[in-house]
Amino acid sequence: MNYKKWIGVMMVALCATANATLYNSGFANGGVIPDGNVAGWSDTRTVSGLTAIADVSINIQLSGGFNGDLYGYLSHNNVLIPLINRVGVTAGNAFGSSGSGFNVTLSDSGSGGDVHFYGSGFASGNYTADGRNIDPASSPGSFDVAPGSRLTFASTFGGMDPNGTWTLFFADMSGGGGPSTLSSWDLEITPVPEPTNVALGCFAFLFASVQCVRWWRRKAHSEKTA
């Protein structure tokens, strides 16, 4: 068997990991987050057929209102992670960001850092979740938290059973800025690979590695004796 076939086997081994599953169904109540109404808006999706959670990420697209007024969380199995919690609010800025709208992907590896400090204007890009597990009506200084005290997707959902309902909630905590409208949200869940698949992948990789070494040794020997 030549080296191209060994490469093929190795590719199979490397691909023997769990694939992420994307959930992006429709919205309740048109996605309108009423202005100054702490009862807010929510949408629930049902997940089934997955193994334990390895990773979670979420994309949120919304327009209108003031970003600094918004509080939003993702919940599952009676636990939640604040995704957006009055972005921009600090001891020195009681009102937070005056920007309007989000098109952000939130994950533990978000390259833009903490979405709470995304800046001004329309928010876009990849960020980590706000993670400030405090009442959104807290005093402005309460939002100045140490990075290590923020919740992450891993600390909130890691290792849990993903099957069942997932709820996205948003509320506008301060009236006057107008309603916000959520146009879409995508939930992506990466499950832990099943043990059988991991074992097969490791075996295939080891087998391919050994055969590659043998092939190179035979090739080197034939060149010496040629």
Identify the residue ranges that each predicted region occupies:
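Enriched but not universal
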Residues: 6, 22-27, 224-225
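Bacterial N-terminal signal peptides that target proteins for export
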Residues: 1-7, 216
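Loop and turn regions of beta-sandwich accessory domains that flank beta-strands and are enriched
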Residues: 21-191
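Bacterial N-terminal signal peptides
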Residues: 8-15
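A short, hydrophobic C-terminal helix/tail in secreted or cell-surface proteins
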Residues: 194-214
